[in-house]
């Protein structure tokens, strides 16, 4: 079992990274959050992943995280009934453990629909499972450090700027998952943000799709 991986970042795409170590290149599945954190690094930079090594009858897959806390959060979510590894990774891309706990307590299941391709019954299913397992989230939160995890933008941004940045990132990911190239998605999102003040990522995406 592989539990950690340190090596040279050879390739980075939305959803995965290639890490070369010891003459072998590994493909590591990553969240959009991790992708954004790695994107600012110089090419061929050395990175270190905390790895969740998944093995089943279909094969093996490495899921990579930049902090042990993110890895443990992923394990908590994927352990819920009916929530697989890829869905857990999507949740991790958009919500922290604190945010997910707040959503479950407040009853705002619709907030989960910020995740691309998570609508209706799917968001309700995720909400139900999280709600039924609040104790697991409480235990996770009580055992984690209060120090912030790696964030390349949070140190210099105001709360308003951070909210806008997060809205932008979510909209770009949504467009990428709809088939847009990342560069095109970024350009279209920035165009909408300059010309109007959309309230959420879904509104940004709808405006872009309407203009096509």
Swiss-Prot record:
Q: Which domain of life is it from?
A: Bacteria
- Segments for region (Flexible linker): 146-162
What keywords are annotated for this sequence in UniProt? Cytoplasm, DNA damage, DNA recombination, DNA repair, DNA-binding
Q: Name one GO biological process term.
A: DNA repair
Quote the CDD domains the UniProt record gives.
Answer: UBA_RuvA_C
Q: InterPro entries under this entry?
A: DNA_helicase_Holl-junc_RuvA_I, NA-bd_OB-fold, RuvA, RuvA_2-like, RuvA_C, RuvA_C_sf
Q: Transmembrane segments in this chain: where?
A: none
Q: Where's it found, cell-wise?
A: Cytoplasm
Q: Which stretches of sequence are listed as region Domain I?
A: 1-66
- Location of region: Domain III: 163-212
Q: Please report which protein family the annotation says this sequence is part of.
A: Belongs to the RuvA family.
The entry's function note states: The RuvA-RuvB-RuvC complex processes Holliday junction (HJ) DNA during genetic recombination and DNA repair, while the RuvA-RuvB complex plays an important role in the rescue of blocked DNA replication forks via replication fork reversal (RFR). RuvA specifically binds to HJ cruciform DNA, conferring on it an open structure. The RuvB hexamer acts as an ATP-dependent pump, pulling dsDNA into and through the RuvAB complex. HJ branch migration allows RuvC to scan DNA until it finds its consensus sequence, where it cleaves and resolves the cruciform DNA.
Q: In its UniProt entry, what is this protein called? A: Holliday junction branch migration complex subunit RuvA
The record lists the lineage as: Bacteria, Pseudomonadati, Spirochaetota, Spirochaetia, Leptospirales
Gene (UniProt): ruvA
